[in-house]
């Protein structure tokens, strides 16, 4: 069984960013909330939108920061400190350039890989990288100079469908994670690849 008590979906705030690739983590958290008949509500003391759900008998808080991506740690640490949640009890969902659309992977710890949201969370936890990550594939533009425009762009419908399918499978694997264990959730998620 997992000890996850907080699931975070990284995003940039505002309607202009809502449908951009960089907000894939928030899409996952929003789906989790909706699948448990909850809606995210703004809580200014946590600098984000929050909800509380029950996954397979486990009390879990959801968070989508309203800070910009590179300040995500401020929001995550505010909520984690208030509820005494440790880094290894947190799952952070984020967009991943190194995975194609239609693929998602989970892991504990590791490098931030240049992702500004992960980097800030790690820094705010005193350079502690030992939180879980859900990496949602968005693909790569093929040129590092085009990355910013790519992550802040909206995916075409075919790519969006692949990303949505991977997020839906990640949601199903979240139940496995909470009720059984990380290895089973990882094995199932890592064997999944959406196709058009």
Curated annotation (Swiss-Prot):
Q: What's the main place this protein lives?
A: cytoplasm
**What is its quaternary makeup?**
Monomer.
Q: Which GO terms describe its biological process?
A: protein quality control for misfolded or incompletely synthesized proteins; rescue of stalled ribosome
Its name, as the record gives it, is: Peptidyl-tRNA hydrolase
Q: What does this protein do?
A: Hydrolyzes ribosome-free peptidyl-tRNAs (with 1 or more amino acids incorporated), which drop off the ribosome during protein synthesis, or as a result of ribosome stalling. Catalyzes the release of premature peptidyl moieties from peptidyl-tRNA molecules trapped in stalled 50S ribosomal subunits, and thus maintains levels of free tRNAs and 50S ribosomes.
What does it catalyze? Answer: an N-acyl-L-alpha-aminoacyl-tRNA + H2O = an N-acyl-L-amino acid + a tRNA + H(+)
Gene that encodes it: pth
Catalytic site: 22 (proton acceptor)
Give residue numbers for the site Stabilizes the basic form of H active site to accept a proton.
Answer: 95
Q: Which UniProt keywords apply?
A: Cytoplasm, Hydrolase, RNA-binding, tRNA-binding
Q: Where in the cell is it found?
A: Cytoplasm
Keyword Zinc-finger, does the record have it?
Answer: no
